[in-house]
Amino acid sequence: MAVKTYNAGVKDYRNTYWEPDYSVKDTDILAVFKITPQAGVDREEAPAAVAAESSTGTWTTVWTDLLTDLDYYKGRAYRIEDVPGDDTCFYAFIAYPIDLFEEGSVVNVFTSLVGNVFGFKAVRALRLEDVRFPIAYVKTCGGPPHGIQVERDIMNKYGRPLLGCTIKPKLGLSAKNYGRACYEGLRGGLDFTKDDENVNSQPFMRWRQRFDFVMEAIQKAEAETGERKGHYLNVTAPTPEEMYKRAEYAKEIGAPIIMHDYITGGFCANTGLANWCRDNGMLLHIHRAMHRVLDRNPHHGIHFRVLTKILRLSGGDHLHSGTVVGKLEGDREATLGWIDIMRDRFIKEDRSRGIFFDQDWGSMPGVMPVASGGIHVWHMPALVTIFGDDSVLQFGGGTLGHPWGNAKGAAANRVALEACVEARNRGVAIEKEGKAVLTEAAKHSPELKIAMETWKEIKSEFDTVDKLDVAHK
């Protein structure tokens, strides 16, 4: 048996963590980082340093390396690629053995992959672009509490996108007036109304009163329309204990769905809440507040496609996904990529949409993408084309800003939605022919006609900051 020797001192990371000949294993967790190295840092040294700091390494050789099988547990930088059109940075591909991570813990995964390594002096900027989770790891995670098909069965709604509305103004309404706004929207044709991300339990509207008035609105709207209705009751709270208290009360009063801010609320809390929803028959809507702090800078942070994968593992039945056409930025091809990541069982590598790895979700349910942010009836043809049926199209100002009130705004959106779905089903290219489709529908809907006149000049044409690096195929 060979005797292990220990040589103290500082070594180049590439001597241990750069392995260009490594054969990736099916069980490895794979990550691709965009690295902007400091001046003078070698092209192979920088990714090796990232692999070391995000797995087993430290700044110097330590004698306790001899007490474990370092070669088994270490992360390995195995490939480098140029970033098209940007010679200041490059892509580095790193493989991590699955045993580095606690089963079913996205918290532990992120602690390694986006932990201390992001403050590493060897790199000037670092961005996690994509992660491949092996099926062996996927199966240790609970995932969405119910998924798309179960939600459709619970709500008894099929064959079209679901229609929602975020109540505005997002802050300042009393609980009674808030409930009235929900009722008007639901009776007008919405499937869901929604708390905004920062509606928790403030002095102007405590959570219990809001829950009570909203549930009264749901029940009244259901009785009038004969349709199942819901409202995303935000249970995000200062502590997990308070969060579960609010969730339990929502269940007690008969609410079908609750809501959580998964980034500001925390991944640990989110996974626990998803497990609770699965056990208690509650749907879980997820808001992504704070995501742009992490994902907007094209050189530093975490790409949103990674945040979607983490959410699918942690658990949520809905996730805000951008709109492409509204007030919030989002590249079309990239958005289509992460919509597939949220919904599909298997997603192939597709650099034209920013997808670096095949991703197999096995039997894990999908997440319903939610389009929300500055959208109105004129956007409906594009939204139905981009998102398809398994989505929620959520109009806040585009409902509540209707000149005739909330119910009429909801009716306008419902007519526009059903007209677009019907035209699409007849084979009409609705994104191209959308104006004609809406104009024809408006002949029989004064609510839609007024909505079209109100928002015909409203556009959001600012360029996207975070663009795809690769040329479209």
From Swiss-Prot:
It is an enzyme of class 4 (lyase). Substrate binds at N116, T166, K170, R288, H320, S372. Its cofactor is Mg(2+). Keywords: Calvin cycle, Carbon dioxide fixation, Lyase, Magnesium, Metal-binding, Monooxygenase, Oxidoreductase. The modification N6-carboxylysine is found at K194. The keyword Manganese does not apply. Mg(2+) binds at K194, D196, E197. PANTHER family: RIBULOSE BISPHOSPHATE CARBOXYLASE (PTHR42704), RIBULOSE BISPHOSPHATE CARBOXYLASE LARGE CHAIN (PTHR42704:SF17). Heterohexadecamer of 8 large chains and 8 small chains. NCBIfam families: PRK04208.1 (NF003252). The basic functional RuBisCO is composed of a large chain homodimer in a 'head-to-tail' conformation. In form I RuBisCO this homodimer is arranged in a barrel-like tetramer with the small subunits forming a tetrameric 'cap' on each end of the 'barrel'. This is Ribulose bisphosphate carboxylase large chain 2. It comes from Acidithiobacillus ferrooxidans (Thiobacillus ferrooxidans).
